[in-house]
Swiss-Prot record:
Lineage top rank: taxon: Eukaryota
Entries under Pfam families matching the protein: LRR_14 (PF23598), NB-ARC (PF00931), WH_DRP (PF23559)
Lipid sites, type S-palmitoyl cysteine: 3-4
GO molecular function: ADP binding; ATP binding
Family of the protein in this entry: Belongs to the disease resistance NB-LRR family.
This protein's name: Probable disease resistance protein At1g61300
Function as written in the Swiss-Prot or TrEMBL entry: Probable disease resistance protein.
Residues anchoring lipid (N-myristoyl glycine): 2
GO cellular component: plasma membrane
Keywords: ATP-binding, Cell membrane, Leucine-rich repeat, Lipoprotein, Membrane, Myristate, Nucleotide-binding, Palmitate, Plant defense, Repeat
Residues where ATP binds: 68-75
Record-linked InterPro entries: Apaf_helical, LRR_dom_sf, LRR_R13L4/SHOC2-like, NB-ARC, P-loop_NTPase, Plant_NBS-LRR, WH-like_DNA-bd_sf
UniProt source species: Arabidopsis thaliana (Mouse-ear cress)
Annotated membrane topology: Lipid-anchor
Amino acid sequence: MGCCFSVQFSFDDQTLVRIFNFLCGNINRNSFGVEERPTQPTIGQEEMLEKAWNRLMEDRVGIMGLHGMGGVGKTTLFKKIHNKFAKMSSRFDIVIWIVVSKGAKLSKLQEDIAEKLHLCDDLWKNKNESDKATDIHRVLKGKRFVLMLDDIWEKVDLEAIGVPYPSEVNKCKVAFTTRDQKVCGEMGDHKPMQVKCLEPEDAWELFKNKVGDNTLRSDPVIVELAREVAQKCRGLPLALSVIGETMASKTMVQEWEHAIDVLTRSAAEFSNMGNKILPILKYSYDSLGDEHIKSCFLYCALFPEDDEIYNEKLIDYWICEGFIGEDQVIKRARNKGYEMLGTLTLANLLTKVGTEHVVMHDVVREMALWIASDFGKQKENFVVRARVGLHERPEAKDWGAVRRMSLMDNHIEEITCESKCSELTTLFLQSNQLKNLSGEFIRYMQKLVVLDLSYNRDFNKLPEQISGLVSLQFLDLSNTSIKQLPVGLKKLKKLTFLNLAYTVRLCSISGISRLLSLRLLRLLGSKVHGDASVLKELQKLQNLQHLAITLSAELSLNQRLANLISILGIEGFLQKPFDLSFLASMENLSSLWVKNSYFSEIKCRESETASSYLRINPKIPCFTNLSRLGLSKCHSIKDLTWILFAPNLVYLYIEDSREVGEIINKEKATNLTSITPFLKLERLILYNLPKLESIYWSPLHFPRLLIIHVLDCPKLRKLPLNATSVPLVEEFQIRMYPPGLGNELEWEDEDTKNRFVLSIKK
């Protein structure tokens, strides 16, 4: 027995269309197609896009971070990567794009992801975060997903959200952008990719694109002025775009000249700078949190545009300004300073230049000055006219409001006014042509903490009113013609750092022992050499921790004084071989400069030469802290094999030493294969070494090398390089003189030649 049902349906055309649309809607709700995100054409980012895409597609890469300063184009690049997934039909099941932004909460991230997964019904919204994480995990664990998180400011806890951790097994991906490189490490990407500013020609193309041909063609002069405006953006896409759009309708030469003038004198006043550029960059400043680190950052704006700021001196400023805390031990305070410096570089607010310098991007610097002036309301809070061609001190409406003033690197010859700078704490006058500093000018600076007068080579006398600077902690008189220290200097009870290096006319430091707070003293290259009377005076400085000094006579240093020496110059030992064995006992020696002296080899112990000591103790270096070494006119030395026990050498300079035939001698280092030299070397400079034939007998690994500079070393035909020696080949330079010498170099093989031939610069 059976039953048979026959049912016939008949639909008109409109009904069929409604059914089709309904079914399509259900299909869309259960699929996860990638919709392209709108984005502008990229200029100058094509290579970076390709590199980032290829890295993300590697099977072993589950998490990838892109970091870079604000406005550099990370989001634009990220959108381009996202849109590439739209062309991949089968490799990934779902691509989720989330804009995180500062202060985003876990619940908000869960909600955004849930919407992409079609989980957001009323029942789901009433669940707690843990249950929501379970739901998200249940959906994603069976899918090959890509999660793209744009603009994260801190670690995103994937587990708490419910996102399965990407691995080679599940082949899922998590990519993100951030301004802070530290976040990359916290997220698990220890080799993040940095999005950098555009190269000059790419920057010009972007700027032209924003300004438009009509404006650029309106007057031939405008093209040249436009190039100058573009250059002031220093390759930052945000600035190029906003300023380019602002100038798009400016067809008069005078308008462009005015723009250049405003951008040069006070960029924060330029149209749209204060509402479209600087506030965006300020998010990075706000994220620093700690007020001391913020102060450290703002301090960097005192230096000129594009200035390579020496890390150690910057940190010494910070210590004296009180940004680093109350630690009285310089080494610990400096270590803390380096940590703070690292925070600023990881946040892409400063950029490392080698290991000893940082630089601040010009637009970031304008942001710092804008903040320091209370967003333009108190412009005289920071008076910064550094490297702008001044011949006299600038004017200010209210000198009593000035807290920090930087007039460094100008042409100022004298300052004679009687302005009452009663709130001034920082005064940078270095690198001018200063001859006269009025006592009346500094009379009222009772709050002055830092005074830098260095590199004023004609400056020969400090006014007696210096004794009134009762708060002064940092005084730099290096590279001046100062002849004597004023009697009133002894009244500076808080003076902590005193730099008298290369004061070639200074005859005496008598009375310096009364500076009881002095912790750092530099006399290197001064006319005051370390004779017995000077050393006796220095031994009275009970709080002294760092000493830089030149010795020109064999003296018996007590161990305390020897341990205080961080920078040592040795000069003029020509009568007999000079015993340098005492150097090994200097625990804090970081820089050594030997000039016009007679010695053949440095001893690491009183009875052991470098080679003999190293054979016995190959893993115990003597000069652990030595980072800079310079030799000049040392005609008795034939090699420098002893630098094998200086593992942290960063800078090596050898000149005018006619017997030097090799840097490392193979025979002396025969049994020292466990020691690899130059792992931290950044700069190698060799000048006028007529017998030099070899640096090292085989190729070496130079992880940090930036430059090899060879001048007048006619027998040096081969460098210790192979194709893998220098990882930073894009930044690496080889400079040979005479210029033709570069063409005559012998290479390890053809691959080595091809890798480095473009590194040879004229």
